[in-house]
Amino acid sequence: MDFLAKDPRTIFLGQAVEYPGTAMTGTLKNVPKDKLYEIPVAEEMQLGITNGLALNNFIPVSMFPRWNFLLLATNQLINHLDKFEIMSQGQFKTKVIIRTSIGSQRPLHPQHQHVGDFSEAFKKVLTTVEIITLKHAKDILPSYEKALKRDDGKSTILVEYGDYYNEK
């Protein structure tokens, strides 16, 4: 996240962004505090704020600890973020980076509502949002670089594996 934080247009928002609470929190320890915006557990509102920031030329990095939480923002994702360019006849090409994960299953399986991977299903309905599943640690930095530097008018969902935080 240090790489993303260097860009003056980036803002990090989500649950446990400014205060500890998820495995992702530790990855933000070097991000300046003025770039961190803690959001209450209100996923649709979070992605709505994210969309508004993107429409104002920021590059929001919106963090959802697990896919299962991102599901609650589906309206903002499918009906808004994915359609801005189409609805505006090309006037708005927003860039959003959504960070999520598939919940850790080791050392203890947390139950099925925490380990969902909906990547393939969402790939079928999203046209201006690319989903990149980070299967190997070596893919992480190049994928975030692509998300930040892309100029094709697409936003990016980066899907991490929760077990990386415990094992890598």
Tell where the protein language model's regions lie, with residue ranges.
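Thiamine diphosphate
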Residues: 1-167
